[in-house]
Design a protein with these regions (language model features):
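Rossmann-fold NAD(P)-binding glycine/threonine-rich loop
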Residues: 92-104, 111-134, 143-152
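N-terminal Rossmann-like NAD(P) cofactor-binding module of classical short-chain dehydrogenase/reductase
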Residues: 85-86
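C-terminal substrate-binding/catalytic lobe of Rossmann-fold NAD(P)-dependent oxidoreductases
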Residues: 18-22, 27-79, 158-279
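Short glycine-/small-residue-rich Rossmann-like dinucleotide-binding loops
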Residues: 89-90, 113, 219-221
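Short, ordered loop/turn segments at secondary-structure junctions
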Residues: 50, 113-115, 137-138, 167-169
Length: 279
């Protein structure tokens, strides 16, 4: 239900955008606050956290490792305090953000992963009244990778076996990653394959030969890996691999901040990073 319009940088970026960060004390939230505070087009006006979070009441900038920004971590969002929200939390936190933004008619950027079918239905329903941009990965490189993976899969066909391997830090809770699933979905959309019928998660057993046309999916959890995604196309005698490596979470944060500025003033609907980047 993405509205069709030519992507362009929103004119509202010429004035200061008041931004709310949901999960501001989290790993991604801190980078959003830190980088957002450096952006001359933005003001981090609201830094949300769950009730009872020990850091509530402290300056969000200081918590994020930068200078004070005169915005305190809070569990409440006053009406009119922000013009858009970015959510990088967990599914339950994302649901709360969707309901809050719907009630206050705020544009919402969602970077939370691990969302269920019910969560996506909630997003679809909310997008009838507010603009929502949801993406498994906000980085420019990954969004180009999605397009490349789809093109290669379509051109090479089932003579080439597709395997997707994603690697993340040991603390990541959901598997496979939202980005890996997005890559698989891009391949399915381009080839007519089915996420339900053709996607195989790992392999275990004494006799499990690979089936023609299936898409293998594998998850690695180790150390402090920010994010690595590889899709390989293997045939007899050759293999083609496309890999994206994120060495810092800042690529996701910068993409989300860019998306939030772009989303201001857009009509209700569901958007993606493709709309922001004009892909």
């Amino acid at each position: 239900m993405t509205p069709s319009e030519t992507p362009s940088e929103n004119s509202s970026t010429n004035s200061l955008v008041l931004l709310a960060i949901n999960g501001a004390a989290g790993r991604m939230g801190r980078r959003l606050v830190a980088l957002g505070s450096e952006d001359p087009q933005l003001r981090i006006a609201v830094a949300l956290e769950v009730p009872g979070q020990p850091l509530i009441g402290q300056d969000a900038g200081v918590v994020s490792g930068v200078s004070a920004i005169n915005t305190l971590l809070s569990a409440e969002l006053a009406a009119g305090a922000a013009q858009a929200m970015i959510d990088f939390t967990v599914p339950v936190g994302c649901r709360a953000a969707i309901k809050l933004c719907t009630a206050q008619k705020l544009p919402l950027v969602i970077g939370t992963t691990g969302l269920t079918t019910d969560d996506h239905q909630l997003i679809d329903e909310a997008a009838k009244t507010i603009p929502i941009l949801q993406a498994a990965n906000m980085s420019l490189g990954v969004n180009f990778l999605l397009g490349l993976a789809a093109q290669v899969a379509q051109k090479l066909g089932d003579d080439y076996d597709i395997e997707i391997v994603e690697s993340h830090h040991r603390m990541k809770a959901d598997a496979p990653s939202g980005t890996a699933l997005a890559i698989a979905q891009a391949v399915c959309d381009a080839t007519g394959k089915s996420m339900k019928e053709d996607l195989v998660h790992g392999r275990l057993g004494a006799h499990i030969p690979r089936q023609r046309g299936e898409i293998g999916m594998h998850a690695v959890r180790s150390g402090d890996i920010v994010g690595k995604h590889t899709i390989s196309f293997g045939a007899i005698g050759e293999e083609l691999s496309l890999t994206h490596v994120a060495s810092t979470r800042d690529v996701f944060a910068r993409g989300a901040l860019r998306a939030a500025k772009w989303l201001i003033g857009k009509p209700a609907g569901r958007y993606s990073m493709k709309d922001v980047l004009g892909l």
